[in-house]
A protein has these predicted regions:
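Juxtamembrane "pre-transmembrane" interface segments
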Residues: 37-40, 51-126, 210, 228, ...
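Hydrophobic alpha-helical segments
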Residues: 176, 207-210, 217-278
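Transmembrane helices with small-residue packing motifs
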Residues: 26, 161, 229-239, 312-352, ...
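Signature of alpha-helical transmembrane segments and their immediate interfacial
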Residues: 211, 281-335, 735
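Hydrophobic alpha-helical transmembrane segments of membrane transport and translocation systems
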Residues: 260-265, 760-811
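Hydrophobic transmembrane alpha-helices and their membrane-interface caps
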Residues: 95, 122-131, 135-191, 231, ...
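Surface-exposed amphipathic alpha-helical segments in non-transmembrane regions
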Residues: 8-47, 70, 74-96, 328, ...
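Helix-loop junctions and hydrophobic alpha-helical segments within the transmembrane domains
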Residues: 99, 106, 110, 186, ...
């Protein structure tokens, strides 16, 4: 029977023994020279340029990053499930740990926000109850909270927003706002029931006739302030957009509730007050305090109206103070958070061996592990995020214990202790940094500047410019941990090839360089199979034969006559220095300057100082650009004034369209700067910075202050239109609106207290938003509501004078 049989042979080698048996030469006497006779064959790692470990032991570090659009919490959960399943098949002695998980900070931060949300809700309920002094009345505005929040969740789903830090912070602010409209409705209904002895149904009907327009106007204005900021571009626009949509939707839904459900509940739940029923002492005290406050408030307005010049001068001082605070309050992009870890970079002199770097790294790890606040220390020796692979660098990631386990020790205190210890190491420089506030924007927190060699600037010019900038910046106390990525003087051995000799010897030039590379570095020659995978085969000289300059004399190439020629006869060697690598940014050779601001300085201040040094000390062909978070901060830095101006413009245009008049919008807007001054004064008092979160709170504050002003101005306008005296109308409106404005403002202010005193993960963000709004609303409710009636009177008088002048001119 005829059959077909395939012929097979040995393919790729797969064992050390097979490689050792490779025949290199057959001698005339019949002997063979095999690979094992001239070389050591072993399974080794593909690279020895870096080492990694954890808590002083060896470890393979695996970083897992999520793709854009993925949910961090879901990814982390699935990774943990997968690792748990894979670990069942690990060989004995091999185990895994997850020392670093950024989602731990995210989940803890969200937990703290939930806690703040609950605290704010409790405080708002208490304020509402003490203000309305009846559980029946309290239920009506409180019902607006879950309805508004649940409805907001639905719209967040439609817009594709997740439940993250920004949206949750927006919901915290919303809690103090969504009850406002319902409180105004309930207070007005109860006042009419008491004063006019009407039934709940009739009182509700009459109250809504006078309130509907004001409620719609106030809520629309509060939503309108977020319209311009929603269209900002970049990272800042994303931050504003999620926050603004959350607030705007919750406010609009609360207004819908106040116009529909709240009146129905008022007519069904509220009951007339029994005059014979004994008064609660607490409520009696509160009512007495409110009555005295109302009387003094109206009296204060009378005095203010009688001295317009003093008020206008004072208002001018307010405007000047705002500009002063705007220049004096330090700026930054986002507040620095305690994310539960920080990095330490050790920089030894260039040319240091990996073994020496490992020794210093082990000492640093041993010290860090003694700190009771430290849980893990992960090290990558021979690498740095600032310069890449370098045997003279080592990066340590210090993962701290959970926030509750650290007592009162802050990450700043821990980093200072580490800095004080490691700076005593004479053999290295130490750089400490926190992670970027927004993962992915830069490799670390702090600032990141790019010095660029433009035009005719050479690499040497860039080196000199970098040294100049580093020198002058290091003289300033505002900087901490200043460093550069420039590696300009790495020790090198230069081999000067005598090309004439090479040609005369008949040696191909490529053989000279390939031989040197094979001995001193490594050369990839083939592949081998193992564990059903393909691995590479490299050749390299043993360590003793590549340690010294003289070893080059042991490297031979074959000449055209068959003789072996040492490389030292084909060239000379000389020690020199040069760059290890040259980085480029926007097509220019660049030097990256990184660092952090000292405790008493902000990132905005140090960025201005660096720009000033660059202008004054560097040549014109050296350019400056910002990257990472610094670029975003620079882009957002000039937006504060423009954002406030746009918000004021939108409020003016909206009110002008709503009331078909320019007088009411001006009367409302001109009373708002005092609230802005209060916000700036608050952050300055608390040592905070003018960052994006503060600006978000500022936009919110303008809307809230405008809302209070509209409640007074809108009612005063109706009184004037009905023929009442201008001043009397303003006083009457202020008298009637004092209690609801005070109640709603107190509810919001106390709702901000948990944010102002926030601690734990994510506390810096909560403080940044809450502090400015908290102090701004206090000033708005104490000083601002005095100015609203005053400016209403002044604007209307000016309006009437213009009308009279026009009539005289016509006649």
């Amino acid at each position: 029977m005829d059959i077909t049989i395939p012929i097979t042979a040995q393919g790729r080698l797969s064992t050390v023994n097979q490689f050792e048996e490779i025949v290199l030469r057959a001698n005339a006497d019949g002997s063979l020279i095999r690979m094992r006779d001239v070389a050591r064959v072993s399974l080794e790692a593909s690279s020895y340029t870096t080492e990694s470990g954890i808590n002083g032991g060896n470890a393979a570090v695996l970083g897992i990053y999520m793709l854009p659009g993925a949910n961090a919490m879901d990814v982390a959960e699935k990774v943990k499930e997968t690792m748990e399943e894979i670990s069942k098949n690990f060989p004995e002695g091999l185990q895994y740990e997850i020392p670093f998980d950024i989602t731990t900070y995210i989940s803890e931060s969200i937990h703290e926000v939930y806690k703040t949300l609950f605290e704010a809700l409790v405080l708002v309920i208490i304020v509402v109850f003490l203000s309305l002094q009846s559980w029946r009345a309290t239920v009506i505005p409180i019902v607006a909270v879950p309805i508004s929040l649940i409805g907001t969740f639905g719209f967040m789903l439609i817009f594709g927003f997740s439940l993250n830090m920004l949206t949750l912070l927006g919901l915290i602010l919303a809690i103090g706002i969504v009850v406002d409209d319902a409180i105004v409705v309930v207070e007005n209904v109860e006042r009419i029931m008491e004063e006019e002895k009407l039934s709940p149904y009739e009182a509700t009907k009459k109250a809504m006739d006078g309130l509907t327009g004001a409620l719609i106007a106030t809520s629309m204005v509060l939503a309108a302030v977020f319209v311009p900021v929603s269209f900002l571009s970049g990272i800042t626009g994303q931050l504003y957009r999620q926050f603004s949509v959350t607030i705007a939707v919750s406010v609009i839904l609360s207004t819908v509730v106040a116009l529909t459900l709240s009146p129905v509940m008022c007519s069904l739940i509220l009951k007339p007050t029994d005059p014979n029923k004994p008064k609660n002492r607490v409520f009696t005290f509160i009512n007495k305090w409110l009555a005295i406050g109302n009387t003094k408030y109206v009296a204060g307005i009378k005095r203010v109206v009688k001295h317009p010049r003093r008020v206008i001068v004072g208002f001018g001082i307010v405007i000047i103070c705002i500009f002063m605070f705007h220049r004096l309050v330090p700026t930054s992009f986002l507040p620095t958070e305690d994310q539960g870890f920080f990095t330490v970079e050790l920089e030894l002199p260039e040319g240091t061996t990996l073994e020496r770097t490992r020794e210093v790294t082990d000492r640093a790890v041993a010290f860090l592990m003694k700190d009771p606040s430290v849980e893990y220390v992960q090290n990558v020796t021979g690498s740095s995020p600032r310069v890449g692979t370098s045997q003279a660098r080592s990066q340590l990631t210090v993962i701290l214990k959970e926030w509750k386990q650290r007592d009162d020790t802050t990450i700043g205190q821990i980093m200072q202790d580490v800095q004080d210890e490691l700076k005593q190491y004479p053999e290295c420089k130490v750089y400490l940094s926190t992670p970027p506030v927004i993962p992915g924007l830069g490799t670390s927190g702090g600032f990141e500047m790019q010095l660029e060699a433009r035009g005719d600037a050479t690499y040497d010019d860039l080196v000199r410019a970098t040294d100049t900038l580093m020198y002058y910046a290091s003289q300033r106390k505002e900087f901490a941990g200043l460093s550069t990525s420039l590696q300009a003087e790495i020790p090198q051995l230069y081999f000067d090839v005598d090309r004439d000799k090479v040609k005369l010897s008949g040696v191909p030039m490529a053989d000279v360089f390939s031989t040197m590379k094979a001995y001193t570095g490594s050369v990839y020659v083939n592949d081998f199979n193992m564990f059903n995978r393909i691995y590479r085969v490299y050749i390299q000289a043993e360590a003793p034969y590549r340690e010294h300059r003289d070893n080059i004399g042991l490297y031979f190439v074959r000449g055209s006559d068959g003789d072996m020629i040492p490389l030292t006869s084909l060239g000379t060697t000389d020690y020199t220095t040069g760059p290890g690598s040259i980085k480029r940014f926007n097509m220019f050779n660049t030097s990256i300057i990184r660092g952090t601001a000292a405790n008493d300085a902000s990132s905005g201040q140090v960025m201005e100082i660096l720009e000033q040094i660059a202008r004054e000390k560097l040549p014109s062909n050296i350019g400056v650009e910002w990257s990472g978070l610094s670029y975003q901060e620079k882009q957002a830095g000039g937006q504060t004034g423009a954002i406030i101006a746009l918000v004021f413009l939108f409020v003016f245009l909206f009110l002008a369209a709503l009331y078909e008049s320019w007088s009411i919008p001006i009367a409302v807007l001109i009373s708002l700067p005092v609230a802005v001054l209060g916000a700036y004064a608050g952050v300055a008092l608390c040592g905070l910075e003018n960052d994006t979160y503060f600006q978000i709170g500022l936009v919110m504050l303008i809307g809230l202050a405008a809302k209070n002003a509209i409640l007074i101005v809108e009612f005063a306008k109706e009184e004037v239109d009905n023929g009442k005296d201008l001043v009397e109308a303003a006083l009457h409106a202020a008298h009637l609106r004092f209690r609801p404005i005070l109640m709603t403002s107190l509810a919001f202010i106390l709702g901000m207290v948990p944010m102002v005193i926030a601690t734990g993960p994510g506390s810096a963000s909560r403080q940044a938003i809450g502090t400015g709004v908290f102090f701004g609303m206090i000033v708005a409710v104490t000083v601002g509501i005095l100015l609203v009636p005053f400016f209403f009177v002044m604007i209307y008088k000016a309006k009437n004078k213009l009308k009279t002048k026009k009539l005289i001119n016509k006649t």
